Amino acid sequence: MNKATWTSLYEVARKICWVLFLVCLPVTSFPFFPPALGGGALVRPLSLYPLIILFLIFTLPTILRKSLPMTLLSVLPFVLVAFASSLVALLHGFQPALGVSIAERMFRAWVTLGLGLAIYLTVSVMAHTPEGLRSSLRWLYVGFSAALLWGTLQAVYVINFSPQYFRLFSKMQRYISIRPLFNSRVSGMTYEPNWFAMQISFLLLPWLLGSVLTGYSVFRWRWRWLTIEWLLLGWAVAVMAFTFSRAGLISLILLILISLLFLRPAHNASPAKEKTHLRTWMRRLIEAGLAVAALVGFIYFAGSYSIFFSRLWSYWSDIKKNSLSGYFDYIGFGARFTYAETALRTYEAYPLFGVGIGNYAFTFDQMMPDQPVAAIPEVLRLLTPEVDRDQLITPKNLYLRLLSETGLSGMATFLAFLVALLGCIIFLWLSPHPEQKFWGKASLLGLISFLMGAFTFDSFAIPNMWVVFGLITSAAWIYRRPVESMPTANAQNVITEGHGEI
């Protein structure tokens, strides 16, 4: 075969692997993973399989031979600081926990961080043109359409439980996730309902809301102002309500509130009919209030089917002697507060470089606040040794993990990376072209979603944030090129602002 044939085959293989990567993103805990690829971990993204091929045949050659987005360099200081913190941690002499040595734990932690960085690098350099970005979003929507369909079918037994129906889907779920289904919550294709909710708020809502706000669509079909993104947004919100994820639903409400109040385009009114800023803000507040009230009402209706979720409001009627601390214990936040206080104490003891990536668990016993562990069953279970269990305690909060494991140096360099991403967003936002404005608004919502969601997760291996960061980097890089950043034939997918508003 000649060179042209090999090049053609290479491009076909690259595109197929990229499509598979995007479509497989909803599957986070795939049961068929060999130990060498993290078969004993909770986070087992199915997208890792096509990612390995992409990284070897495309990402690495691109890094070595071609120019790269300068934003990629902004993550390098954090990686160097994390590496330094790991080296310093070897000098502390931490004792093994649950039979796991510090060397083994650090290796696992660096594998997860390496996986996250590989996702970020690959997503950042995969698309070469605006059409490549649009195609990526379309395939992302395809994957999540399958996940939403699976979640919709799960919502049936949440609303009206049928043992036979539930057993059928439980059997099928075994081929998708390592964890069985919940009979009162929707978990999609993920490990648990909260993961599904955060997946939707990270990887789906920012782009859908950005499309609705700007009137831009990556699909050709539309009926007046109605687009595929409008339909997907309504579907995603409806399914997300049945996850009964407190963090996910709070994120949903805040994203919609921010979109309605601050990101809506202004009406094109004539000077004679132009309204004052006060009246405009009053109108927006009323509309946002009505939208949030309707959403909260729907969530309350859905929550009536879940004893777990209804605890958010049943405490004050069920418990006679109530208090704020008792309320947080009642809704299951006691363990989170223990993890958080322990992480802060660890940071105070090791302020500059922390205890090293993945080593939070080795100091947990010494840094834990003085309180009876028996009162917090979740903490007690994780501290008690069991046969064939080596799952160690983590902070369940990315900010606190960065502080406790990489210290002030790691937190500062990671925040600097986020500032670099914010610069990309501002560049896209200020562009006069509607398509770039879409990427600016959607990217801002993606960053906001991360900033909120980082309070509830701490894993570097979950693809959500790295995919969002990669799309932001890629969009800014592509539209900085003078030739390819010109308006394209997809301009017909932009409608007037008046029709594109929420």
Label for each model-derived stretch:
Residues 36-40, 190-194, 243-251, 394, ...:
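Membrane-interface catalytic loops of GT-C/OST-like multi-pass glycosylation enzymes that act
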Residues 40-60, 107-118, 196-204, 250-257, ...:
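Membrane-embedded alpha-helical segments of multi-pass membrane proteins
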Residues 149, 155-159, 243, 260-331, ...:
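A membrane-periplasm/extracellular boundary helix in multi-pass inner-membrane enzymes
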Residues 79-83, 114-122, 134-279, 300, ...:
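Alpha-helical transmembrane segments of multi-pass inner-membrane proteins
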Residues 15, 22, 53-56, 252-260, ...:
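Transmembrane alpha-helices of multi-pass inner-membrane enzymes
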Residues 1-96, 100, 104, 128-134, ...:
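Transmembrane signal-anchor hairpin modules in multi-pass inner-membrane enzymes, especially those
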Residues 30-37, 174-189, 381-400:
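Juxtamembrane membrane-water interface segments that cap and precede transmembrane helices
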Residues 326-341, 349, 353-406:
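Long extracytoplasmic/lumenal interhelical loops at the membrane interface
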